Swiss-Prot record:
Keyword DNA damage on entry: no
Site location (Lowers pKa of active site Tyr): K82
Sequence positions that bind substrate: H118
SUPFAM superfamilies reported in the protein's UniProt record: NAD(P)-linked oxidoreductase
Function per UniProt: Oxidoreductase; part of the gene cluster that mediates the biosynthesis of sirodesmin PL, an epipolythiodioxopiperazine (ETP) characterized by a disulfide bridged cyclic dipeptide and that acts as a phytotoxin which is involved in the blackleg didease of canola. SirD catalyzes the O-prenylation of L-tyrosine (L-Tyr) in the presence of dimethylallyl diphosphate (DMAPP) to yield 4-O-dimethylallyl-L-Tyr, and therefore represents probably the first pathway-specific enzyme in the biosynthesis of sirodesmin PL.
Residues the entry annotates as binding NADP(+): 54, 148-149, 174, 203-213, 288-296
Molecular function in Gene Ontology: oxidoreductase activity
The keyword NADP appears for this protein: yes
EC number: 1.1.1.-
Active site, renumbered: Y59
UniProt-recorded name of the protein: Oxidoreductase sirO
Entries under InterPro entries matching the protein: AKR_Detox_Biosynth, NADP_OxRdtase_dom, NADP_OxRdtase_dom_sf
Organism: Leptosphaeria maculans (Blackleg fungus)
Family: Belongs to the aldo/keto reductase family. Aldo/keto reductase 2 subfamily.
This protein's encoding gene: sirO
Length: 329
């Protein structure tokens, strides 16, 4: 049995942000760093019929793509990657072309299945960025165009321009969505439905906060390690009393119904959120070990949660929505 045992549910995409990741300041590894370790993950994915890998130029400083290339993963999986993001100028023609060239070389492929704009670059016009994306598509660099972390108005602007130029249109939007991050339901998702764009939900565990937020924040390891920029950024977004209270309430709810917290978080996104498998939506799942990946996929295949638990989970959003960061960057 596998996630494909629920054919009408959103698809599962495996996120490789931690592939090739360096140790944190306390010497803890986030994920696989050798071909042998990476192969263990891929074997689990094949066991569960998950065939889409998601990476990005900036993941682990480029080491994620490099490890996937060393694994020759594109021979067995659909490969999706993203242009460089987060920095001013990442959307210029030169930057986008350079990013794809680097990704192509690291992955060992000439074409990827899906190529994303990772983050908005508000110092560069969307027109220049889209001109370059279409140039890459015409050159046979990718099959499907995706976008991520854009505001709804930016999605509309980009789509309108691309359509006016008869360019490839974005057909996937990848954004954060979970029990504690539901801002996308108000404006973004309705727009995506209108434009025929699929939604892939990342961070279904809310960056792990749904799994004992207080302990994770106090430990200050991994993505919460405040010795680096990413950790400081994450703490600024989520290290708030409301999130700790919501996480504690979530643990209590899961205990009451006898379900694992991680499993409940994944299953809510896949079976009870506004994602629709019939429209091609998906959920991005990550893991810090092959064993954890196997456990997570096993939890997901259990299917929908009990109705009583789903009803209680709906109240979690009210605890954090006033403090919740925007769905876009």
């Amino acid at each position: 049995m596998s996630p494909s045992a629920h054919p009408d549910a959103p698809i599962i995409i495996f996120g490789t942000a931690n592939f090739g990741s360096p140790e944190d300041s306390k010497g803890k590894l986030f994920g696989p760093v050798t071909v042998e370790q990476g192969r263990e993950y891929l074997d689990v994915l094949q066991e569960f019929n998950v065939d889409v890998l998601d990476t990005a130029r900036i993941y682990s400083g480029g080491e994620s793509e490099k490890l996937l290339g060393a694994l020759d993963a594109s021979r067995e999986f659909k490969m999706c990657t993203k242009a460089s993001g987060t920095l001013d100028g990442c959307g210029t023609r030169d930057a986008v072309l350079s990013a794809f060239k680097a990704s192509s070389e690291a992955l060992g492929v000439k074409e990827v299945d899906t190529y994303y704009l990772h983050t908005p670059d508000r110092t560069t016009s969307l027109e220049e960025t889209m001109d370059t994306i279409n140039e890459l598509h015409k050159a046979g660099s990718f099959k499907t165009f995706g976008i991520s972390n854009l505001r709804a108005d930016e999605v509309q602007h980009l789509h309108t321009y691309a359509r006016s130029k008869n360019y490839i249109l974005p057909t996937i939007y990848q954004g954060t969505y979970n029990l504690l991050s539901r801002q996308c339901e108000t404006k973004l998702l309705p727009l995506l439905r209108t434009l025929g764009i699929r939604f892939y939900a990342y961070s279904p565990l809310c960056c792990g906060l749904l799994i004992n937020a207080e302990a994770k924040l106090q430990a200050s390891t991994g993505r919460w390690d405040t010795s680096h920029f990413g950790g400081k950024f994450m703490n600024a977004l989520y290290n708030k009393p409301s999130y700790i209270a919501a996480s504690n309430a979530f643990q209590d709810m899961c205990g009451k119904y006898g379900v694992r917290p991680a499993g409940a978080a994944y299953r809510w996104v896949r079976y009870h959120s506004e994602l629709e498998g019939g429209l091609g939506d998906g959920m991005v799942v990550g893991a810090s070990s092959a064993r954890q990946l196997e456990e997570s996929l096993g939890e997901i295949e259990k299917g929908p949660l009990e109705e009583g638990l789903v009803g209680e989970l709906e109240g979690l959003w009210d605890l954090v929505k006033e403090d919740a960061p925007a769905y876009s960057l």
